[in-house]
Each structure stands twice: as C-alpha cells, then as structure tokens.
Curated annotation (Swiss-Prot):
Homodimerizes by swapping the N-terminal TIR and C-terminal nucleotide-binding domains. Ligand binding induces lid closure and repositions the TIR domain. The TIR domain mediates NAD(+) hydrolase (NADase) activity. Self-association of TIR domains is required for NADase activity. One of its GO terms (biological process) is positive regulation of type I interferon production. One of its GO terms (molecular function) is NAD+ nucleosidase activity, cyclic ADP-ribose generating. Pfam families: STING_LBD (PF15009), TIR_2 (PF13676). Residues 29-163 form the TIR domain. One of its GO terms (cellular component) is endoplasmic reticulum membrane. Homodimer. This is Stimulator of interferon genes protein. Residues 387-415 are annotated as: Disordered. Residues 401-415 have a biased composition (Basic and acidic residues). The keyword rRNA-binding does not apply. Sensor of cytosolic DNA from bacteria and viruses that promotes autophagy. Binds c-di-AMP, 2'3'-cGAMP, 3'3'-cGAMP and to a lesser extent c-di-GMP. Nucleotide binding has not been seen to stimulate NAD(+) hydrolase activity.
Amino acid sequence: MEKNGAHSFLSDTPVTSLTMSVPVLRHPHVYHAFISYCADADTSHARTILDSVESRGFTCCFAERDFLPGECTSDVVVDAIHCSKNVILVISPASLQSEWSKFEMLMAVDDSHQRNNVCLVPVLLGGVKVDDLPPPLRPLTCIELMDDFRNTDDIIQAISKPEDTWESLLPVGNLAHGFAWGYYYGYLKIILPDLDKTVRQWRRVNNAEGRMSEKLFLFFPQSCRCRDSIADESSLIKHRGHLPIITKDRAGIIERQYKNTIYSVTDDNGEDYFFAGEYIGVIHTMFEMEQNATTGLQTREKYVQSMRFYLTLKRILDTDPECSKKCKIVFYKDVNNSSDAMPKLICNEIKNQLRKESSDDTTVCMTPFNSPFPSISSPDFARCSLKSPSSTNMVKSEPNIYREESGKTKSVERG
C-alpha cells in the first residue's frame, strides 16, 4: 500500500486470496455493502465488483438488480445506504460529473458521520486520483482497481475489517461538534430569534423593500479563511451599516453587545441589493490551525472537520424552528475565482430568497445538489463552485434531486 497524503492510501499491488469470516449483520443493517456507481458508464465494473464480493458470502444492495423499475428515488437510496454496513463508492471520471453519483456520495458521507463510523470504501477507476475526490473522501483509504480486477480482495478486506471512528482519522480530535454547539448557544441562539423583525424595520427605513431578504446570510468559505469584511471580496460589495445592537449580560461581561452588519451588492444590471451578512467566524480557527504546524491539523483533515461542523450545525438548527428559518448558510469556493463571482452568488441567493418570501414558499429549495451550499440542507463538496446552477445544468439522464429547507430529500425519480 503506497501512502498518498496524510491518511490516504492507494492500493498498487494485488492481494492474494484471503480467508475471512463474513461479519454478522445487526440492526439496522441488512446488507454488508451498498454499491454506488454511475449507471451510465460504470455498470459493468460495478457488477464485476458485486459478483466478486457476493461470491465470498457477502450480501450487497445493487440498484440495477435490487430496485424495482421507477423505484430509484432519493428516499430509496438514502434508506438503502442506512441499511448497509458499508458503502462501496465506485468512483470514475464519469461519476465525479454525475449529479446522481455525487448525491449518493454525499448521502453516504452524511450517514457515515451520523453513526461516526468510517464505513466508506472508495474504489477508483479510470485514472481517478485521491486529489480528484470530494474533500471529505480524501482522508480515507482508497483502492485503485486494476484493469484485470486482480485486487478485488482489497475491497473484501475493507468491508470485513473492524469499524473505525472518524476521530481515528483526525489527530487533533473532533473540533467540529464543539465549534458547532458553541456557535449555536454562544451566538446564533442570541441574535436569530428577532432578526427578521429588525431586518424588516431596517429595509423599510432605508427604502430597500423588495431588495433585501429577511434572513441572515452566513458565509462559509471552503478554505475556512474569513476576511475582515465581506466587502473585501469585491468592489461591488459595500458596507452600508448595521442592525440595532443587541445588549446582553453574558459570561461575566456586563452589557455585551452583538451587532450584525448590512452590506449592499450590485447586480449585472447595476441595481443594488442589500443583505445582513457575515462569515461563520468560528471556522476561521480551523484555517489558523491549518497554518500552524504544531496543531497537527492538515488540509484534508480540515475539510472533514468543516463538513462535520456543517452537518452538526444543520442538525442543531433543524431542532430549533425559531432559528433555522432565519439564516442561510452560503458555501463557496474562495480560491482561483474571478472578482465578480462572489457578487453574482450573493445576488442570486438574495433574489431566490425574495421569491420564496414573496410567495410564502418555505417548503422546497429548488436548487439542485451541484450548487455551493444553496441552503442549509445540501453542501456539495464534490465540485464546489460559485457558478449559479439551474435546471439546465442537469444531465438529461440524471435525476433532478432537491432537498426541502428542513433538510429532507424530495423524492424525484431518475429521468
């Protein structure tokens, strides 16, 4: 096994036939593995893996065989992943471009983090390398499948080994949960409950009706690096003031002040839109730890920690309706992007929220999964981009997959 990065490995030699017992399945698992693959390009490879694994006594869930016609919906896939002890991710150049495959990867990562077990087995095809993978998958042990399938025993060994926790991949410990709970109780729980009222008051006084969402925009740069001001992102973004200050006695600090900033952003037509927005400041700690070698936090581990932070914060907010509908997390890739990318992203988010607010539509976020954190429901670490996605971006043979604002998937069949 050749080491490739801090915790990523590629198998480059065949493993001789192994004698191993088949693990006993316990509730809720009814399969040893769910096999995720791109149906348009990789079915034959996936079926060869299926035959090899099941010939050794393992039970797999394989969509082409086990799902009824018309049954391959997002809900069915989520249930199948949850009922599987492991997920074998067959990853090829095609699957990295497939919205359905990226959805399955995201659901597998989410389920793995929920149970805190490293139960994902990335199998790489077609020259895919670790650095090509979505960031949350890069710390995992990867298997580079040989053209003659001689090393399928590596896959069998991977799904047979004792379970590891995610903490075993994170030398600095689990930062994410503490950061998320601290951010919620120490900040969001204080400023969000009445935020929509103060925003409505500000936009009425400042003649911003129809050009400002009621939500607080929380910006989440992929690098976790937070600038001093959002206006530093582009000359099209300007500081315009702040909402009324909230004063609260807190942790020995008398009359501690909480202040939320208002910005404007200019769209392609030269019209100004307004938003209350800020970076999720706590994640900047991870960026600073990454820069300091003594902390032991490396870039790939930072990606895992940041996703765990997001998922934990999402679950916390989902239990608090008073807060969850009053903020919008906006994830974006902040490296090698043009200067007008951020303003376009913000304008699109504001206009999307205004449409929802004007129609009182809070049920479905009609932005596909290839968007950069379109709502507090679906981070796509597979291909983060500032490009504003639309239904025309979806490949015809792929499903339109959407999530509700609550985070639940909406069942949409493959097209």
